[in-house]
Amino acid sequence: MQKLLLFDIDGTLIRSNGAGRLTLAYALDKLFGTVGPLESYNMSGKTDPRIITDLLTAVGIPPKEINNQLPAIYELMAEHGQKIFQEKGMAACPGVPELLTELSRQPNVLLGLLTGNSQLTAPLKLLAAGIDPLQFKVGAYGSDAMDRNDLPAIGMSRASQLTGEQFDGNNTVIIGDTPADILCARAGKATAVAVASGWHAAATLAEYRPDHLFENLGETNHILQTLLS
């Protein structure tokens, strides 16, 4: 039986150094002439459509108008990202390249993404951090659902369609750096692996009782054993 490993991107695989916030500001200002309360908004663990909707409804823009413009917002974010991601010095988090190399050698592992980023932006961020996005065979993205808790089922379904095998919570692991990643793993009845390589300390993540908790992904052999167990 194959095991599906779904990785978050920002704070888990890469450090984006604020680049995502800049691309969002560019797109919102271009389309709506405002970025809403972006400067004070906590984006951690949220999907792009959730963030966009929160920011724009806060300044009185109707949800229907926002929803109609989401595809255009994603396109503008990706367009701006292609220009600035390399300049922002984005990099892989500690241990990530080594871990992905080892996982790619495992015959019964299917690598995937579960991220709040749109499907257009996600591969651009990975490339800018030196990670090949093509090694991730399936993905569930912010552009698929506003609620992050809906993404595990989407990822599992796409993995099943790709391979012809059944994927559910019993053979799926979700790896992320925020409480939202742990909660969405629980929503999908998947194994929750938390890593304190983002904005949240290990003690904070521990309060949400993930199945496994690491400071970072640097202990390749130990983490490999955990993910494959």
Describe each model-derived feature in a short phrase.
Residues 153-182:
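Conserved Lys-Pro-Asp/Glu-containing loop-to-beta segment of HAD-superfamily phosphomonoesterases
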Residues 174-212:
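Acidic, Mg2+-coordinating phosphoryl-transfer loop and its flanking beta/alpha structural elements
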Residues 1-7, 59-62, 171, 225, ...:
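Non-catalytic pre-domain segments flanking phosphatase-related domains
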Residues 12, 96-129, 139-146:
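Substrate-recognition element of Asp-dependent hydrolases with the DxDx(T/V) motif
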Residues 40, 44, 67-71, 133-147, ...:
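A short, structured active-site edge motif that brings together acidic residues
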Residues 57-101, 106:
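Metal-dependent phosphoesterase signature
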Residues 140, 212-217:
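Short acidic-hydrophobic, aromatic-tinged amphipathic segments that line or gate anion-handling sites
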Residues 1-44, 50-53, 57-58, 202:
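Active-site neighborhood of HAD-like aspartate-dependent phosphohydrolases
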